[in-house]
Amino acid sequence: GHYTGLMYFGREAYGKKNIPVFAMPKMKSFLTNNGPWNQLIDLKNIAIKNIQHDSTMILNQQLKVTPFLVPHRDEFSETVGYKIEGTKKTSLFIPDIDKWKTWNKSIIEEVKKVDYAFLDATFLDQHEIKRAMSEVPHPFIQETIALFKNESLATKNKVIFIHFNHTNPALQKNSKQRKEIEKLGFRFANEGDNFEL
């Protein structure tokens, strides 16, 4: 559902021109063949740039980005994470994924390879909303913490939680849950944060 924000580039809102939109093949097809998204392309509000699984894009002399597929609902498009490489540091960006165990890679090993790991923290635990959590699959923060339980403080400190549902109590900076998680060595992204790459 995150693609819905593209509508704000159209003539009803910003009326932008040629905003680059990096899209995997299935997402490109969806945007090209469905309204109102195809109108954004026809009116040149957005310009689709093709990306491929595990194919590195060099954005400039200081920044490389590699998209990779992750398992998620995928009703309308692929779901991807990104490895982002700067001149000094590297980050992992996975805002959406079903569960860590459904991915064909070890999240622990992938985190160890980077300086920062921005990870899906949609829900704190399975009791957060009053419906079947299988309808909105995401790794609970508590599951991620359990996976990293025996890892070093340095490894835990690379994990920066992002992508919170409004029901997640850890979204609140002064919540008991957030403070307990931070004591374990994990971090939370905040609006205005900057991370050197």
Model-flagged regions — what are they?
Residues 13-17, 37-47:
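A short alpha->loop->secondary-structure connector
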Residues 19-28, 118, 160-162:
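Short internal beta-strands
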Residues 26-36:
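A short, active-site helix/loop in glycosyltransferases that binds the activated sugar's phosphate group
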Residues 16-20, 91, 158:
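Short active-site oxyanion
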Residues 1-15:
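Di-metal (Zn2+ and/or Mg2+/Mn2+) metal-binding site signature of metallo-dependent hydrolases
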Residues 48-110, 193-197:
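Core dinuclear metal-dependent hydrolase active-site scaffold
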Residues 2-5, 30-31, 170:
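Phosphate- and divalent-cation-binding pockets in alpha/beta enzyme and binding domains
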Residues 88-90, 97-193:
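Cap/insert and terminal regions of metallo-dependent hydrolase folds
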